[in-house]
From Swiss-Prot:
This is N-acetyl-gamma-glutamyl-phosphate reductase. Its main location: cytoplasm. Its EC number is 1.2.1.38. The gene is argC. CDD domains: AGPR_1_C (cd23934), AGPR_1_N (cd17895). HAMAP family: ArgC_type1 (MF_00150). Signal peptide: none annotated.
Amino acid sequence: MTHNVAILGASGYTGAELIRLISQHPSITIKALAAERKAGMEMADVFPHLRHLSLPTLCKIDEIDFAQIDLCFCALPHKTSQEVIAKLPGDLKIVDLSADFRLRDPEAYEKWYGNPHAALEQQQEAVYGLTEFYRDEIKGARLVAGTGCNAATGQFALRPLIAAGVIDLDEIILDMKCAVSGAGRALKENLLHAELSEGYNAYAIGGTHRHIGEFDQEFSAIAGRPVKVQFTPHLLPVNRGILATTYVKGDAQAIYETFAKAYADEPFVELLPFGEAPSTHHVRGSNFVHIGVTADRIAGRAIVIVALDNLTKGSSGQALQNANLMLGEDETAGLMMAPLFP
């Protein structure tokens, strides 16, 4: 059976990544591509690396016949996404890649994103889209909210440990290095090559990064009490990848065994041999997550390192993984390509 999909926001990085992945999918066809400011253009003119694919001409959202669409990927900016999704057909399956439906509490959304939520009915309906932990809910969902790329990385490092009670919940430090593509394709002065290359800086210091809202929501729900991690992201002058170094108080061997049990049957999560450290090089362009555990020299402390590709597993790959479940397809369809190396 072939499923027809539409991609809204197809001219951004996550939209292009969705097209790349879906082009290898055995049973999904791209029926419509929307990009309001580039309507009428061909994808080959927006992203020349997709020139070999036969794709629909970019159009406006209101030009799409959603009666012909089985599932819609919404890769629009937050705030815009909720406005658009609220107007889409009520029976349409949707995977949203923005931040608009990740937080269940409307007050939390307003706190982190600065605006009241304009689609409260859809917000309450949405299922959080971290596939490995919400698989059953996603299968029956109409609207799935993709996670933040940083939020996904941190959760792969910490969710099983919090659930198993093998770490001190008040002693968690999360240090994350993020590729520049995570900031999107819009022109910004601080992301110009001359401003960014050959440098490295922290940002959103002091607990102000918006993805902390997801950490607070998810970790506290698992623990049954408030959990607050100390999180600082850093911007790297690279195109793809996130590397999270997590410092926790707990027995390193118990932590390793917890991961081994939690991820034993996960097709996209690779637990490295004890003491080995992941690299973003080894997950680039893939839907895989690599996790490493090392004992710290300080007794009773451990270091957990997680690497993933922010555009693939952190966004578009996760979105396709969720779409597979929603459409009744094999979860891994279109996603088992090997990472790009070197």
